[in-house]
Amino acid sequence: MESSAKRKMDPDNPDEGPSSKVPRPETPVTKATTFLQTMLRKEVNSQLSLGDPLFPELAEESLKTFEQVTEDCNENPEKDVLAELGDILAQAVNHAGIDSSSTGPTLTTHSCSVSSAPLNKPTPTSVAVTNTPLPGASATPELSPRKKPRKTTRPFKVIIKPPVPPAPIMLPLIKQEDIKPEPDFTIQYRNKIIDTAGCIVISDSEEEQGEEVETRGATASSPSTGSGTPRVTSPTHPLSQMNHPPLPDPLGRPDEDSSSSSSSSCSSASDSESESEEMKCSSGGGASVTSSHHGRGGFGGAASSSLLSCGHQSSGGASTGPRKKKSKRISELDNEKVRNIMKDKNTPFCTPNVQTRRGRVKIDEVSRMFRNTNRSLEYKNLPFTIPSMHQVLDEAIKACKTMQVNNKGIQIIYTRNHEVKSEVDAVRCRLGTMCNLALSTPFLMEHTMPVTHPPEVAQRTADACNEGVKAAWSLKELHTHQLCPRSSDYRNMIIHAATPVDLLGALNLCLPLMQKFPKQVMVRIFSTNQGGFMLPIYETAAKAYAVGQFEQPTETPPEDLDTLSLAIEAAIQDLRNKSQ
C-alpha cells in the first residue's frame, strides 16, 4: 500500500505536519509502530488526566486491550498487520521508541506488558506506562529488519520496562553512641585509664620525676601517634599465642618483670657516641625528653610508638641502650684532609685581614696564601724544578747496579689537567699488569705555613746532632702556627719495585709521560731507609735476583758431532795405553 505524494496531517499526532518530501513506502513494521504509538498515547492521556479539567476525559469503553483489538479484526483497519503481528511485534516495539534491552530490572508496576494470552476479565488498563521519558529508537542486530523473522506458533509475551536509575545500596544506620574506641588501646597514667589514641607526656616538675607511664599498644587497626611512652605492650592476640621467636626490642628496654627500673637516667648513654648525639640529657634537671621511635608491628605491621625518658634518679639504676654500629663507608678524599680533622677537633684558625683576589700569590704574602678557605692551591704547571730524563735514568741505573732496590722508589707528580690525567690513568693500567710492583693511589699534599728559623735555633739543632742520639732525642723545637693548612691541586703517586728488572720496566713506562708533558708531569727517584719492601712477599724475588747473577746456567748447549767423536776416540786411545 503506497501513500500519496504529500503526507496528510495526523490529528492524533499533531507534531508531524505535512511534508513535501515523498515518504518511503510503509512496511508492516512501520504500520505496527503507528498502531502501538496510538495505543500508548491514549493510555498516557488517560493517566495524565486524573480528574484534571485541562485534559479531556476518556471513557473506559474507548480503551481496549491488545487481545480485544486482535479479536476485533474486522473493525480494525490494520487487520493485515495483526495477521503477522507475531513476527513483527518485537521490531515495532523498538521503532515505537521502547528498547527492552536497555532497560534495567525494575518493579512490575513500572512496566508495559503485552500478552496474547486470553484474559478472564477484561481490565480497563492493560497497558501501564509511567511518565518516564522513553529512550530513543534503536535497533539491535538481533531485531534488525534484514534478518529472517523467527517462526513460532507459541503464545509470546513481551515485557517492556523503561530505564530507571540503579537502586542505591542501603547501609545500616550507625548511631554516634555505638561508635566507641577500641578497648585494646588504653593509657594508664597515675593509676588512671585514659581513653585516648595517644599521649605525649612532658614533665617539668620534681614531683613527677621517676613516675611510670604505661601505654598498651593496640593492634594494626589502631592509629599510631608521633610520640609514645616508656613501655609499649601489645594486647592478647590469637596469633601472639604461637611459638614465635622473640623480637629484639629496638630501644633495649627490659621485660615487664623488671619494670621497676624502666625509668632510668642517661648516665650510661656515653657507651655509644651515636646515641649521645641523638639524646642530650642534663644530669642536674629532672626533665624528661620525649622522642618518637617508629618500629614495625609484631604481626599487623603497624608502627609502634615509644617514649625515651632521660633524667637523674636517686636509685642509681640505669639501662643502657643498644650500641649503634658505625658506618664503615669509605670517606671521600676531601674528608681525610688535615684541615678537616683540625676543624673537627675545634682547632682555632686565625683569620688574617687580607684582600682575596684571583691571580698569582707572592712568596711574602703568607697570610693571604694560608687563609681559612676550602679552595686548593691551583697550579697550571708544576711549581718546582723538574729534573731531566737523563738524570732520572742515571739515578735508576746506579741503584740497579747494587742489585737491591728495596730502598728506592719512583715518584710521579702531575697536574689535574684532563688530558694529563687520561694519559696517567692509561699508564697506571699497564703498571697494574706488571709483576713485583706496589702502586699507590693518587693523593694530595697539604702544606703548612712557612717560617724562617732564627740563627740560635739552627745552632741548637746542629749541636744536638753532633752530640749524638740522646741529645737529638731530647731536643724540643716545635714551632706552631694558627693559619689554615692548604692543599695543592697536583696529584702524587709512588711506585715501589722489588727487583731492578721491575724498576727499569716501570721507569720505561713513566718516562714517556715526562717527555710528552714536560711542565705537567715529573718523574723522579727517591730513597728510603732499609725498611724493606711494602710486603714481605717480594723478599724471595729480590734475593733470587742477587744470587742469579753468580750462578752458571743450568742448561748447557749441545756439543757438536765432531767434538763428540773426537772425545770418543781420545777415550779409546787412553784405554789402549793403560792396557799396554
UniProtKB/Swiss-Prot annotation:
Recorded protein name is: Viral transcription factor IE2
The UniProt keywords, alphabetically, are: Activator, DNA-binding, Early protein, G0/G1 host cell cycle checkpoint dysregulation by virus, G1/S host cell cycle checkpoint dysregulation by virus, Host nucleus, Host-virus interaction, Isopeptide bond, Metal-binding, Modulation of host cell cycle by virus, Phosphoprotein, Transcription, Transcription regulation, Ubl conjugation
Can you provide one Gene Ontology molecular function annotated for this UniProt record?
DNA binding
Stretch list, region Disordered: 1-30, 99-161, 206-335
The UniProt record lists the Glycyl lysine isopeptide (Lys-Gly) (interchain with G-Cter in SUMO) crosslink at 175, 180
Basic and acidic residues composition bias: residue spans: 1-11
Coordinates of motif SUMO-interacting motif 1/SIM1 in the sequence?
A: 199-202
Q: Where is this motif: SUMO-interacting motif 1/SIM3?
A: 501-504
Give the motif span (SUMO-interacting motif 1/SIM2).
410-413
Q: Which GO terms describe its biological process?
A: bidirectional double-stranded viral DNA replication; DNA-templated viral transcription; regulation of DNA-templated transcription; symbiont-mediated perturbation of host cell cycle G0/G1 transition checkpoint; symbiont-mediated perturbation of host cell cycle G1/S transition checkpoint
Explain the post-translational modification: Phosphorylated by host CK2 at Ser-203 and Ser-205; leading to enhanced SUMOylation. SUMOylated; SUMOylation is enhanced when IE2 is phosphorylated by host CK2. The sumoylation is necessary for efficient replication of the virus and thus for the function of this viral transcription factor.
Q: How does it assemble?
A: Interacts with host SUMO-modified form of TATA-binding protein (TBP)-associated factor 12/TAF12 in a SIM-dependent manner; this interaction increases the transactivation activity of IE2. Interacts with host CHAF1A. Interacts with several components of the host transcriptional machinery including TBP, TF2B and CREB1. Interacts with host DNA replication licensing factor MCM3. Interacts with host PLSCR1; this interaction inhibits IE2 transactivating activity.
Q: Which residues are connected by disulfide bridges in this protein?
A: none
Q: Where in the cell is it found?
A: Host nucleus
Task: Briefly state the protein's biological role.
Answer: Stimulates viral early and late gene expression and thus play a crucial role in the regulation of productive infection. Selectively drives host RNA Pol II transcription initiation at a subset of viral early-late and late promoters without substantially affecting Pol II transcription of expressed host genes. Mechanistically, forms a repressive complex at the major immediate-early promoter region involving direct association with host nucleosomes and TBP. Concerning activation, stimulates transcription by binding nearby, but not within, core promoter regions.
Per UniProt, what is the name of the gene that codes for the protein in this document?
Answer: UL122
Tell me yes or no: is Ubl conjugation among this UniProt entry's keywords.
Answer: yes
List, as start-end ranges, the regions of compositional bias called Low complexity: 216-236, 259-271, 302-317
The similarity annotation says: Belongs to the HHV-5 IE2 protein family.
Record PTM Phosphoserine, positions in chain: 203, 205
Q: Does the keyword Manganese apply?
A: no
Pfam families attached here? Herpes_IE1, Herpes_IE2_3
Q: Which GO terms of the cellular component aspect does the record hold?
A: host cell nucleus
Organism's domain of life?
Answer: Viruses
Please note every region of biased composition (Polar residues): 99-133
